[in-house]
Regions:
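Catalytic machinery of carbohydrate-active enzymes
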Residues: 1-289
Length: 289
């Protein structure tokens, strides 16, 4: 790989896609948002890192090159699959981005950790600029579940968080993305019956495009899923992400953004065990007008 890289004399811009748990659409949408930034106006090579082999990065890069709406010039595309040992086994809470940067440096590839911070450089500053328009109709997005049972809030937690937020400010509107079990639970059914004008359930047939669009208009997002968390950073929306810090949701893949609060339980346990007060404490950091 190092020999191939040194032979590419015309390569000037490298875009690193930290793609763990991210859908193709989220990566594509983030690239669209980068189009106006001069230093990334031309991307020569996109590097992708992901331990999940089923994702077709060649298809993604072809799609990137073919989509004229992105506004980026991709003069060359290559896929480097670098074998990176699971950082959870090395140092449990060291961010995976650090390992990626060290691996690149060992290959003679210059990059920086700032390129790994949630896909969008300076997203924090942009998020602050957008807060005025978001507060005109303040909506909070509660994503109730992830890809495994340990990464799922209980219906009781969701309902309790929602009721506390509704009581805090009469202008707050809540959207809850619930799985089938949560959606039919007595707690959420009663919540929606009690607050029909202020709480809505996100439709179950929604796509990742719909999800990202909904997140982009919110003042804060709560999620136990790292894919949704990185999507929120790409959408430049403040977020609270809850980790169980076990095999399927290691904190080493957390978003790197100063408008992302990461919560951990006191011990490795399902997210459904996290106290509601701790969740609310994280959310309320972003509820200051």
């Amino acid at each position: 790989m190092a020999e191939y890289w040194s032979a590419c004399e015309n390569i000037q811009n490298v875009f690193v896609v930290p793609s763990r748990d991210l859908s193709m659409f989220v990566r594509l949408r983030a690239l669209r948002r980068l189009a106006g930034q001069a230093e990334l106006a031309n991307i020569d090579v996109a590097l992708s890192f992901d331990p999940i082999p089923m994702i077709d990065y060649f298809a993604f890069l072809h799609w990137l090159q073919a989509d004229a709406t992105i506004g980026l010039s991709v003069t060359q595309y290559s896929l480097f699959r670098i074998s990176i040992p699971d950082p959870v086994l090395e140092v449990p809470r060291r961010h995976a981005g650090e390992r990626i940067v060290r691996t690149l440096a060992a290959l003679g590839i210059a990059t920086g950790l700032d390129q790994l911070k949630g896909l969008v450089p300076r997203s924090s500053e942009v998020a602050m600029q957008r807060r005025g328009e978001q507060w005109a109709r303040p909506r909070i997005f509660l994503n109730g579940f992830g890809a495994s049972t340990t990464r799922t809030f209980s219906a009781t937690q969701l309902a309790a968080v929602a009721r506390e937020l509704i009581a805090q400010d009469s202008t707050f509107q809540l959207t809850i993305n619930a799985n089938a079990e949560q959606r039919t639970s007595p707690e959420l059914r009663q919540l929606c019956a009690d607050q029909p004008s202020r709480v809505q359930l996100f439709r179950p047939d929604a796509t990742i495009c719909d999800l990202l669009d909904a997140i982009a208009g919110c003042i804060v997002v709560l999620t136990p899923d790292t894919g949704v968390a990185h999507g929120a950073v790409a959408a430049r929306t403040p977020l609270v992400v809850v980790f169980d810090d076990v095999e399927y949701n290691p904190i080493c893949w957390r978003p790197l953004d100063r408008h992302a609060v990461c919560l951990l339980p006191e011990r490795p346990e399902p997210i459904s065990c996290m106290p509601v007060d701790k969740i609310l404490e994280g959310i309320r950091q972003f509820l200051v007008r």
